[in-house]
Structure formats: C-alpha cells, structure tokens
Amino acid sequence: MSPRILIVGGSMGGLFAAVLLSRAGFDVTVTERSEHGLEGRGAGLVAQREVFDILREVGIEHVARVGVTAHERIYLDRSDRIIQTQRTPQTQLSWDVLFRTFRDLVPDARYRIKARALAVHEDPVGARVQYTDGHEETADLVIGADGIGSIVREAVSGAQSKPSYVGYATWRGLVPETQVPHLAQRQLFERFAFYEAPGSHILGYLVPGADGSTELGRRRYNWVWYRRYTPEELHGILLDIDGTHRPFSLAPGHLRPELAQTLREEAAERLPASFAAAVAAEPRPFIHAIFDYAPAHMVRGRVALMGDAAFVARPHTAMGVAKAAGDAFALREALLRHPDLDRALAAYQAERVPVGQAIVAYGQRLGRGLLLDRA
C-alpha cells in the first residue's frame, strides 16, 4: 500500500510534486488556502533547465513554446537614452499557462481550495495538519509547498525560523500592452529594459496575456521596480487598504490609493520617461518585500519542505520555479529509491539542502552587484 501524501500549498511547486508523485503511484492530495484558486496571478518566467525537464517528463513540452521573446537587452540613462545594448534574446514563458496545464493534471477531488493550514503536528507514524475551519487531516508524509510564509515550516524549523528582510522590495505592474503609452511602447517593447540608480533598479519586458496569448495587442508589459526601504517604512507600506498588516506582500488592489499615487509621482521624478509612463499605466500596483532564508534542514520526521517554504532566494536568480521543479524531482526519486520513508526523506534532504543554500547565496551575490545598497 503506497504512502498517503498530503501537500500543503497548491501553487507551482505543489502541483509539480502532486503530478510527479501521483504518476509514480503515490496517494496524493493537495490543499490550497486561496478562496478561488491561483489562476491569473502570474506574469512571465524564465524557464531554466529543470522547468524544461519537468515539461518533458510529463509530456507537455508544447507549453515551453507559449512565450514572448525580448530580442535584445537595453540599458537606459535618466534622460531615457539607450546607453548600452546587448543582443541576447530571452523568452518569457507564461506562468498562467504553465499553472493551468499542471492544475488540469490534478483531479479536482485531489485539489481542495479554501483549506488554510493552521499548524502541523508530528504523529508517531506520520503527521497531522490542522486547518483554520477546525478539521484535521493525517498522512504518512506532509509536504510543505506553502511558500515564503509557510505554516508547515514551523513543524520543521520552529516558529522562530523565519526569512530575513534584505532591505529592499519590488513594486510590480502587469499592464495590458494596449494601455501602455506609445512613448513607452516605442522604447521598451520587444526588449528587456533596465535602469539603475542608487537605491533603485527597474526592469521590464513583455509577457503573454492572462490567457497565455502571445498575439500582438493581447500581451502584457511586466515592470519590476526595486526600491530600498527601512523595516519601519516597509511596515507602513504593507498596511493594506483595510488597515491589515501583511508581512510579505500586497496583492493587486490591496495598496492604499494614496501610496499608489505617491509611487507614480516618485516614478516621474526618478525614472526615465518610458519607465515612468509604464508605471503610471498600472492602476493596481503591487509590492513584494525581498527576503533571504537558507536553513540547514528541510525535513523533520514525516514533514518535508520544498520550494519557497524550504529556501527563499532573491528574485534576481529567476530560479524560483526551477528550484521547485528540482525539489519535486528529487523527492520523487528519493521515495522511489527508498521504500522506507525516513531513509527517503534523509536522502532528499541531503541532496537538496546544498542546492537551496547555493541558490540563496547566488541571489545574495547578484543583489550586491546592484546599486540597492546605496541610497
């Protein structure tokens, strides 16, 4: 009888694990805290080797062809003049298409939304997940794929083991391309654009539309603006429109209107005109604070972590989805190679902890190479 596996977290990493493990013969259920699912929340992603590997493994390599290619990289100065060009094409795949494709591979009966985990407890021969609605579920193995604010992580590393804020955050916008002013379209479209200044770094590129479309007029422009903030400044920004403090991010529509207006004004003051226009075109900007987290363990008893629940790397690496795919592969192989669950989890941890630590360190090196440590 195959072990019963409960995956807490139904985003990309949880889906990768669910598909690989269920196809390997394991009894897998996914629980996801969101009320309506996660469709439409992603932008573009740079597909690393592990992403192509999992697409090939599952037989859906066609998903890798749904993307928008930036034909060159450009670097702007404050006057909006191109000061450097690199002929390095890069394709941004559709997060939404990738998510929907993997979500469709998990039966609805095995993917339950509106299930918010409250705590995870070890049992003598497994683990037990307690949910906010009062019900509990037990499994032979619980996998925490619940992201940066992981509840499952506490069962592995303790309540005091939390990601560390690195001193800056990313403002983001995802604008239908037809709503971007022509000035910005002429300068930015079909390119991967950058502008750096002390304490500030912005980049932008086209990504597929929410439906995965790559047709002209149906794509979106994705901009990402890194800004330095003290912990006190960040705390004030992360008070959402209802006055609730969010520890890591604010989703679109949750930013207070006066802060959105301030962001547009600061963009006009500090950014090249094309980027300032792109920022102003986003009616619902959102923000993610940036954190590091690199523990020595990702397993305790019958509880294992993966993805951002296990290690949090800075987004400069563009390896978040690839890291989750690598974790899913390693976990499946360990469980197939070692019938004993404890030995399997020990093997999984031994393989993936060094990888996670290396990716976090890589993100830290990339962060030091920017101007974000200079206000």
Language-model regions, residue ranges each:
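Conserved N-terminal helical subregion
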Residues: 1-5, 22, 40, 46-178
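Conserved FAD/dinucleotide-binding core of flavoprotein oxidoreductases
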Residues: 85-88, 94, 99, 180-278
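Conserved acidic E/D residue at the C-terminus of a beta-strand in Rossmann-like folds
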Residues: 30-34
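C-terminal domain-closing interface element
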Residues: 369-375
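Conserved Rossmann-like nucleotide-cofactor binding loop
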Residues: 13, 36, 149
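Histidine-centered metal-chelating micro-motifs
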Residues: 150, 170, 201-203, 310-311
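Conserved mid-domain beta->alpha element of the FAD-binding
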Residues: 7-23, 27-29, 143-144, 171, ...
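Flavin (primarily FAD) cofactor-binding/catalytic cores of flavoenzymes
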Residues: 114-119, 129-135, 268-281, 286
